[in-house]
């Protein structure tokens, strides 16, 4: 049986905790997969491969089928020190940050993309990644100023979908539009002031579309909305507050994906 790492002064703790920060992830070119769901996704994917696993003695038995590399067995206290959450699940892995897809290839190969302008809530981004993967979008594009998709909370909220959905980061809106126009992909601004209603627009949805979503607090800048091919809104009952960004994105992704290719 593997010896158990018990020292809270171990350099392994510092290495893992560094990945809690954007600076640490960039320096190491790695990120964290925490919990059995994320680790399992990492073991099954060709993207973002595992570089090192850490497990507690209990998890060594409980999650034995997930151990694709020789793990370092750690005490509960060491696992707690490594984890970014209060209730560590006994297993985590460091994963390599592979090169992300080329934007032009992504627009060429996709019929349905999502663009998020300066999204800053990691839970929202993780949920959008999960919804996009589950409901049929082919990829996600993030603007500069958006939250890091490799941040621990984003990875957790994606529920493993981070390993499946192609995405690119630090793409200005103008760059996205140029790439989309090359392949006749239409840009669709999702805004509360949109003249077109989603229910009707979906019936005439372009064969290649990228839906543009704004920041949680400020929405989509007018200058971006005006440059889109279409401005669309989600109809709501009078008096209702605007929907959460992740909820809006899920509704749009489902409707658009189902219109392009019915989900079964």
Report each predicted region and the residues it spans.
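Structured adenosyl-cofactor binding patch, chiefly the S-adenosyl-L-methionine
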Residues: 93, 131-135, 149-162, 222-264
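N-terminal positively charged helical leader segments and presequences
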Residues: 1-86, 186
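Active-site/ligand-binding-proximal alpha/beta "capping" segment
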Residues: 189-240
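RNA substrate-binding interface of SAM-dependent RNA methyltransferases
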Residues: 103-195
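Short loop/helix-cap segments at secondary-structure boundaries that form the rim of catalytic
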Residues: 61-68, 105, 222-226
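Acidic/glycine-rich phosphate/pyrophosphate-binding loops and surrounding catalytic core
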Residues: 86, 90-108, 146
